[in-house]
Amino acid sequence: MTKPAILALADGSIFRGEAIGADGQTVGEVVFNTAMTGYQEILTDPSYAQQIVTLTYPHIGNTGTTPEDAESDRVWSAGLVIRDLPLVASNWRNKMSLGDYLKANNVVAIAGIDTRRLTRILREKGAQNGCIMAGDNISEEAAIAAARGFPGLKGMDLAKEVSTKDTYEWRHSVWNLQTDSHPEIAASELPYHVVAYDYGVKVNILRMLVERGCRVTVVPAQTPASEVLAYKPDGVFLSNGPGDPEPCDYAIKAIKQVLETEVPVFGICLGHQLLALAAGAKTVKMGHGHHGANHPVQDLDTGVVMITSQNHGFAVDESTLPGNVRAIHKSLFDGTLQGIELTDKSAFSFQGHPEASPGPNDVAPLFDRFIDAMAKRR
């Protein structure tokens, strides 16, 4: 027997549905994601910390869940909102239904609401703070008050909260269909040593670096640059992550010090924003952000249009780029900046997700550019 649930927005909007996860209450910034697949990757992406994710595709959970599709060791999304949860999950890789997965991970979630109406509200009014209440004891007034009490992501440093607490080495590559596994590659077969700052890194990023010959040392977000440079890395990677980049002063300071060397730097998502801040640019909070796997981005040098995976609520303000920073990618949805490079350093970054997971691989060659930069320095 299903239990009731409600979603309340800070503007007073109420959506009634049914609970499909854990009982209880959760608050966060409500965003919408237009990806048709990849719900498990989305839920386990640390970039979604403190966000309640609305999936616009109407049928979510058709293929169940499997440990191999997780992008981290836990669910980071604050909550989940969907239109319909299928009664049966059917896929040869399925290990657990989405509903059971949500309960097992203590995720408060709601189904059976008009996600089209919700998406229109978020599109027109911008991302809003919200509250999901699920179970027998729910109150519209209390839910609205909880939504309005959430401080919002502006000014919130979440990178240090989701980051690893300990340094570790990563040598697992991308999925191998023949062995049905993520093979671990011997260090002797990995010619490049990359130190990756973990601001909320997705494991598929690490796998794609290993696939291209990198032995990756993953360090906590607050690691000083001196410790990173002591590894004598061939390159430094700045990962994706949640929250507002501007409060991450420890990261900006460290990146500035790395940029004083000749070590190549590559940033993705939050790492892109932090690189821009370290170079002297500014960032801004977006209205409803970019969340999906079908976003067109143009390479400004070649004119080529790529379909990309996106997940960010902040953006680099192109008008604030200093003279030594050049725009190299732009969104064709709203013209916001998607990529930069430093003209006097071997450093570049991309706002979207070249590793996809979920999404297309049109931008994966940026990993190859990073490899080329490290090879040229040798």
UniProtKB/Swiss-Prot annotation:
<dbReference type="InterPro" id="IPR002474">
    <property type="entry name" value="CarbamoylP_synth_ssu_N"/>
</dbReference>
<feature type="binding site">
    <location>
        <position position="313"/>
    </location>
    <ligand>
        <name>L-glutamine</name>
    </ligand>
</feature>
<dbReference type="GO" id="GO:0004359">
    <property type="term" value="F:glutaminase activity"/>
</dbReference>
<feature type="active site">
    <location>
        <position position="353"/>
    </location>
</feature>
<feature type="active site" description="Nucleophile">
    <location>
        <position position="269"/>
    </location>
</feature>
<feature type="active site">
    <location>
        <position position="355"/>
    </location>
</feature>
<dbReference type="InterPro" id="IPR036480">
    <property type="entry name" value="CarbP_synth_ssu_N_sf"/>
</dbReference>
<dbReference type="InterPro" id="IPR035686">
    <property type="entry name" value="CPSase_GATase1"/>
</dbReference>
<keyword id="KW-0315">Glutamine amidotransferase</keyword>
<feature type="binding site">
    <location>
        <position position="241"/>
    </location>
    <ligand>
        <name>L-glutamine</name>
    </ligand>
</feature>
<comment type="similarity">
    <text>Belongs to the CarA family.</text>
</comment>
<keyword id="KW-0665">Pyrimidine biosynthesis</keyword>
<comment type="pathway">
    <text>Amino-acid biosynthesis; L-arginine biosynthesis; carbamoyl phosphate from bicarbonate: step 1/1.</text>
</comment>
<dbReference type="GO" id="GO:0006207">
    <property type="term" value="P:'de novo' pyrimidine nucleobase biosynthetic process"/>
</dbReference>
<feature type="binding site">
    <location>
        <position position="270"/>
    </location>
    <ligand>
        <name>L-glutamine</name>
    </ligand>
</feature>
<feature type="binding site">
    <location>
        <position position="243"/>
    </location>
    <ligand>
        <name>L-glutamine</name>
    </ligand>
</feature>
<feature type="binding site">
    <location>
        <position position="314"/>
    </location>
    <ligand>
        <name>L-glutamine</name>
    </ligand>
</feature>
<comment type="subunit">
    <text>Composed of two chains; the small (or glutamine) chain promotes the hydrolysis of glutamine to ammonia, which is used by the large (or ammonia) chain to synthesize carbamoyl phosphate. Tetramer of heterodimers (alpha,beta)4.</text>
</comment>
<feature type="region of interest" description="CPSase">
    <location>
        <begin position="1"/>
        <end position="189"/>
    </location>
</feature>
<dbReference type="GO" id="GO:0044205">
    <property type="term" value="P:'de novo' UMP biosynthetic process"/>
</dbReference>
<feature type="binding site">
    <location>
        <position position="311"/>
    </location>
    <ligand>
        <name>L-glutamine</name>
    </ligand>
</feature>
<dbReference type="GO" id="GO:0004088">
    <property type="term" value="F:carbamoyl-phosphate synthase (glutamine-hydrolyzing) activity"/>
</dbReference>
<keyword id="KW-0067">ATP-binding</keyword>
<comment type="function">
    <text>Small subunit of the glutamine-dependent carbamoyl phosphate synthetase (CPSase). CPSase catalyzes the formation of carbamoyl phosphate from the ammonia moiety of glutamine, carbonate, and phosphate donated by ATP, constituting the first step of 2 biosynthetic pathways, one leading to arginine and/or urea and the other to pyrimidine nucleotides. The small subunit (glutamine amidotransferase) binds and cleaves glutamine to supply the large subunit with the substrate ammonia.</text>
</comment>
<feature type="binding site">
    <location>
        <position position="273"/>
    </location>
    <ligand>
        <name>L-glutamine</name>
    </ligand>
</feature>
<dbReference type="Pfam" id="PF00988">
    <property type="entry name" value="CPSase_sm_chain"/>
</dbReference>
<keyword id="KW-0436">Ligase</keyword>
<dbReference type="InterPro" id="IPR029062">
    <property type="entry name" value="Class_I_gatase-like"/>
</dbReference>
<dbReference type="InterPro" id="IPR050472">
    <property type="entry name" value="Anth_synth/Amidotransfase"/>
</dbReference>
<dbReference type="InterPro" id="IPR006274">
    <property type="entry name" value="CarbamoylP_synth_ssu"/>
</dbReference>
<comment type="pathway">
    <text>Pyrimidine metabolism; UMP biosynthesis via de novo pathway; (S)-dihydroorotate from bicarbonate: step 1/3.</text>
</comment>
<keyword id="KW-0028">Amino-acid biosynthesis</keyword>
<keyword id="KW-0547">Nucleotide-binding</keyword>
<protein>
    <recommendedName>
        <fullName>Carbamoyl phosphate synthase small chain</fullName>
        <ecNumber>6.3.5.5</ecNumber>
    </recommendedName>
</protein>
<feature type="domain" description="Glutamine amidotransferase type-1">
    <location>
        <begin position="193"/>
        <end position="378"/>
    </location>
</feature>
<feature type="binding site">
    <location>
        <position position="47"/>
    </location>
    <ligand>
        <name>L-glutamine</name>
    </ligand>
</feature>
<dbReference type="GO" id="GO:0005524">
    <property type="term" value="F:ATP binding"/>
</dbReference>
<dbReference type="GO" id="GO:0006541">
    <property type="term" value="P:glutamine metabolic process"/>
</dbReference>
<dbReference type="GO" id="GO:0006526">
    <property type="term" value="P:L-arginine biosynthetic process"/>
</dbReference>
<dbReference type="Pfam" id="PF00117">
    <property type="entry name" value="GATase"/>
</dbReference>
<dbReference type="InterPro" id="IPR017926">
    <property type="entry name" value="GATASE"/>
</dbReference>
<keyword id="KW-0055">Arginine biosynthesis</keyword>
